[in-house]
Amino acid sequence: MRTPIFQVDAFTTRRFAGIPAAVMPMNGFLTDAVLQAVAAENNLAETAFLVPQGSDYLLRWFTPTTEVPLCGHATLASAAVVMERLEPGRSTVVFHSASGPLTVTRTTLGYVMDFPARASAAVPTPPELAAALGAEPIEVVANAFN
């Protein structure tokens, strides 16, 4: 099987700057083990895998060691691949992910991402955090991703 892999530097207009992410468009997701192996081979913070679903895309992200529920820079990189390479001229794309639908729109100023808001709540301070900081934090908060 041959499929392109794009490496995109997100959050920059300069080459070799920003945050790199790999983007791999596919016709269908391969097994989790294969996706994980591809991400490990890329050895970037995240590799995004996208599959068309109607006019939208399914989107998953893997680090070199695990799948993650949400990744901003790899979503932005995926949108750039869709709008600049796969469907030139397209100005909005919706990705369906483990975190729900994510919309990215291209404007004259750049890309705008609409991401879910996750409520945070105070949690007990982990002893190892206080030890590492050398002080007791005023407050520690977590959300659904912690």
What do the predicted segments below correspond to?
Residues 1-70, 76-146:
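Active-site proximal loop and beta-alpha junction motif in alpha/beta enzyme cores
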